[in-house]
Curated annotation (Swiss-Prot):
Residues 66-99 are annotated as: Disordered. Gene3D superfamilies: YggU-like. This is UPF0235 protein Avin_03050. InterPro entries: DUF167 (IPR003746), YggU-like_sf (IPR036591).
Length: 99
């Protein structure tokens, strides 16, 4: 299993979140998941909201096009990005096969 997959025009990411980091950044792979460090604390949904905003900015989409599919109260999360406009340089990330 890869840390991402395409579902039509949507990109699904399997993430491992590290809250309360010194800066927001991708930190390589953590097993079969993309490790993401965020400055937000893991309280009252702040880290989740920060994650969605961070990914929206990186993939060039409005925040409304990024949603948490699973892992609301866990470090292991699955996120859907609807029709990403840009792809960051991440290990193994390839454009949609039919693009």
């Amino acid at each position: 299993m890869s840390w991402y997959r395409w579902d039509g025009e949507d990109l699904i990411l399997a993430c491992h979140l590290q809250p309360k980091a010194s800066k927001d950044e991708f930190a390589g792979l953590h097993g079969e998941r993309l490790k993401i460090r965020l400055t937000a604390p893991p309280v009252e949904g702040k880290a989740n909201a920060h994650l969605l905003a961070f990914l929206a900015g990186v993939f060039g989409v409005p925040k409304s096009q990024v949603s948490l599919e699973s892992g609301e109260s866990n470090r292991q999360k699955r996120v859907r990005i609807r029709r990403p406009r840009q792809l960051p340089a991440l290990p193994g990330l390839a454009p949609r096969p039919d693009a």
